[in-house]
Amino acid sequence: MRYLSTRGHSAGERFCDILLEGLAPDGGLYLPEHYPVLDGSRLKELRKVYQTQGYAQLAYELLSLYVDDIPAQDLHALCHRTYTASVFGNPLIAPLRYLTPRLSVLALSNGPTLAFKDMAMQLLGNLFEYELMRRGEQLNILGATSGDTGSAAEYAMRGKKGVRVFMTSPHGRMSAFQQAQMFSLMDANIFNLAIEGVFDDCQDMVKAVSSDLNFKRTYKIGTVNSINWARLLAQVVYYFAGYFQATTGHAQRVSFAVPSGNFGNVCAGHVARMMGLPVSKLVVATNENNVLDEFFQTGLYKVRDSAHTFETSSPSMDISKASNFERFVFDALDRDATRTQSLFAQQLQTTGSFDLSKEACFATLAQRFGFVSGCSTHTHRLQTIRDIHRQHGQLIDPHTADGVKVALEHLEPNVPMVVLETALPIKFANTLLEATGQNPPMPEAFKDLEKSPKRFVTMPPDVAQIKAYIAQHCG
């Protein structure tokens, strides 16, 4: 399997090359040259693999389709070392939890940091360490987080050989629990940078540093954000696991509702659907920062600046510039790299928007790719949390509540709807308290977390300053 950039760069890169590189040299995002398509008989085989050998073996089978430069026995060992009951607290790794016979939640938050990001990040940490040791190299990971990516990355990379993590986050815009998870880490290879701005400022800094090829190569800069194909690929696996749990036969269709900010999670669903997984709808659920909902409703993709990005009670979705969206647009435009380059590298940079409403591809988006969307507000998510708690005796976090609210708007007869869980409720205790009048249960391992000493550096959203900081700490 070879990989190409959404903006046209194609030098025959293989998986391990793009694992370490992250962003393509032309500023585009890597995708495989083609998506392997699984027919009904292969889906039936994979269902049996999942039911008899578990999640780790399913991950190995699916990753093998995209990874041919890691020996099979090594990839097998990496998958089985990553997806264990001891790491994820459940032998199913990602169990399905029913709310009603037609509506369920895929529990993705059983990992070390209690968020779905662990599902990919734990594998990424093991892949990085494996490949860096094989090459005898080091990697400096530069990332941006709106809350959960940062802690998932840091817990996956802490103590790993040959890896440093420089994680940017919007200063004061994460929940107290999220901040404590990250800033309490004292490992020598972990550096937390609190940026005076919003998540989009952090993400722009990461892209700017990654686009400086000389700096990137001098300081061996890599990324764990979902612009890294390896992370998105790892997320594809749980769509298959969710499908196999929600159905009994390979011809049945399922819809997935995905709380969305950066478009990485639902983009993995897009890849699974392109591979032949029988997905009816991919439901994009946004919060008040509804840039993606606006696009799927109108064809207009209009990013917002920091001043117009709302601070909400589902903060991990407070994003107005969805970095993974470029991958989907590339596919929607029949992989026209020239057009994708024009839209994202030129038009979006100069005008802050583009409009596909009059193009033939937009009229067929739902039919070809299954995408539908909706928006949820603070009032909606509080009511949804209350309703789920009263009616089903379950607590869900505010992002998952956004997913449930929009999922209910897109139910189809005889098609199971699976909502992808974002995090455990304790990560957003204040919102849960407001909604239900009670604090969510605190896992024993995290009881004194928010009282722990913290280590982080505050800086403005200045690319030169972050480069200087990285250079200073990579000596």
Where are the predicted features?
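PLP-dependent amino-acid enzyme catalytic core
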Residues: 1-475
